Amino acid sequence: MVQTRLDMGALKPIDDLMFRVMAQSKDFCEEVLRVLLEDPGLTVVECTPQSAVTNPHGRSAVLDALCELSGGGFVDVEVQRVDEGDLQRRARYYASLVTADRTGPGDRFEDVPDVCVAIVCEFDPFGAARSLYHMDRVLRETGEAGDNGLAEVYVNALARDGSEVAALMRLFVEGDAYDDARFPETSSEKRRLRETEVGRMAMGSVIEEIRAEGEAKGEAKGKLETICGFVRDGLVSVQDAAASAGVDADEIRRALAAQR
């Protein structure tokens, strides 16, 4: 128990576990987004940490924090400690999932919601020593800016360039850094989780949730592997296996294809 407390006390907002708990606070998310999106008047209506967006025919995703803004747009905030994978393609895919998930069957294209993906990195994603990077759409032939409602923002949490973004990111990556004057919500939530028993209990409950989720995924994976084995051996058809096990037939087919 002592070791667990020490470990949780060493966590920072850039860590997935602490961010997952801090993102339950709408005020924290609003404070962060006002800085990252450079909009002091921004208002967050709702924030959902670990928001699941599904693709019935392909890869789904669990977003670190999906925030709905007062103007009707959405911001997906991701924290990334390790430089792995293609961040730009990840941003594009996550934005497409949110767009599809929040657009109704009869909605007109002009009513498709604006979506922003903001990825906070504990490394410099583009190597230019900037605290903030914006990926914009530009009409190649004229140089004019285009706007299809998608925005991408990449944050270098290690930059120390004197900007407000850099000052906020110092709280994200340095354990003992606080700034109650400029970032009261971030500072108070961080202090609560790191230094109080109530905060440690909150993070401990999330750890238990994560452990339970992992066990459930393991059981589901084992069940699917068993079903695929029966189908490969010709003991049962895909449709019959799906019906008896309560598993989607397409999911079985995808698993079989992946095992070939």
What are these regions (language model features)?
Residues 1-260:
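Elongated, amphipathic alpha-helical interaction scaffolds
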